[in-house]
């Protein structure tokens, strides 16, 4: 059983795409300001991209992290929510305008992160990690030895399937919360 991030991939994701629905002029700045308080590797990718673009980060109040789902906080009096599709939908945010781009990004092996402001979708920032050059060969060798190889990931099923195809992993368990990975192994 392999965890995707840092085992199959290098564990150093980078921002690849920004889909802005036009509600805010500075999606990356807002996202990085919120994500700077998170320890997630995807958050680090967003902050790094903002720094690369010399964007100043804004102060965040009332920051809350929900592991495996996302984060929330207040910036200049507005409530921001960032994370996977599940947390966005659980909070009643209409993401119909973002479903098609999110699906396309996931099918490309990228992880779409949704952002909302005061309950309205404002965009997606996608990130991707580089697959280690040895991953496909290692999986092929394990399969040749009769070892059943499984990848666990918190990513959505489309992103997981794209990585699965690139590496040749026979079975994937996607959308696994961090606290549930041990249970999946058993």
Ranges and model annotations:
Residues 1-186:
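Cytosolic catalytic headpiece
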């Amino acid at each position: 059983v392999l965890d995707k991030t840092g085992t199959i991939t290098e564990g150093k994701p980078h921002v690849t795409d920004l889909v802005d629905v036009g509600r805010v002029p500075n999606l990356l700045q807002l996202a990085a300001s919120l994500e700077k308080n998170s320890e997630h590797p995807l958050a680090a990718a967003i902050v790094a991209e903002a720094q690369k673009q010399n964007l100043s980060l804004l102060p965040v109040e009332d920051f809350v992290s929900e592991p495996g789902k996302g984060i929330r906080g207040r910036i200049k009096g507005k409530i921001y929510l960032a994370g996977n599709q599940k947390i966005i939908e659980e909070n009643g945010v209409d993401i119909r305008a973002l479903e098609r781009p999110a699906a396309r990004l996931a099918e490309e092996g990228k992880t779409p992160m949704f952002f909302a402001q005061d309950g309205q979708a404002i965009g997606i920032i996608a990130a991707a990690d580089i697959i280690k050059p040895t991953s496909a060969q290692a999986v092929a060798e394990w399969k040749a030895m009769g070892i059943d190889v499984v990848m666990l990931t918190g990513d959505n099923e489309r992103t997981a399937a794209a990585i699965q195809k690139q590496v040749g992993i026979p079975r994937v368990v996607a959308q696994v919360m961090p606290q549930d990975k041990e249970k999946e192994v058993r």
